[in-house]
Regions:
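Expand to "…catalyze enediolate/carbanion chemistry for C-C bond making/breaking, isomerization
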Residues: 143-144
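Acyltransferase
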Residues: 1-140, 149-162
Length: 162
């Protein structure tokens, strides 16, 4: 779409949530221009109320701050497998964690690929912790066969059966 329109927009994919759902991030004025282009091409879009251009290059100042803070922390090897939302792969080298956390600020969240990777590696039960069911809904869009639980309060925790 953009090849025939403005090519210098700062609008980047921030989240690849599921088939047919991506989130864009960038300069407000550029996103507003992109919304017009999408509407002209009959592409459904919703402008989300967010406070910053998360997961895009405009977050470079926050990346620097995060790096300084993470450099003060000594991480220890954990017992559980971790999937990076930056790579959508399992983190095999424990020393990569800090770098991946830093990269996550300016790079897209590869949620769809992360979930597919987990399912392909025999994860069949997802638990969403916190208010709402947004992530559970995204997982269902990716694969309806997995078990999904949501934890919103103490009662939910007590009723959880793993």
């Amino acid at each position: 779409i953009l090849k025939d329109n403005e090519k210098n927009l700062i609008a980047q994919i921030a989240n690849d949530n599921s088939e047919g759902q991506i989130v864009l991030s960038g300069k407000i004025e550029d996103l507003d221009k992109l919304i017009i282009i999408l509407k002209e091409n009959a592409i459904k879009n919703i402008k989300l109320p967010v406070s910053a251009p998360f997961h895009c290059s405009l977050m470079s100042k926050a990346t620097s701050i995060m790096k300084e803070e993470l450099d003060k922390i000594n991480f220890k090897q954990g017992n559980n497998k971790l999937i990076s939302n930056v790579t959508a792969n399992e983190i095999l080298d424990f020393n990569e964690i800090k770098d991946l956390l830093i990269k996550q600020i300016e790079n897209r969240v590869r949620w769809r690929e992360s979930v597919i990777n987990m399912i392909n590696n025999d994860v069949n039960h997802f638990i969403e912790i916190g208010p709402g069911k947004v992530l559970s809904g995204l997982v269902k869009r990716i694969n309806r066969e997995v078990k999904i639980d949501t934890i919103n309060n103490q009662v939910d925790i007590e009723g959880l059966k793993i």
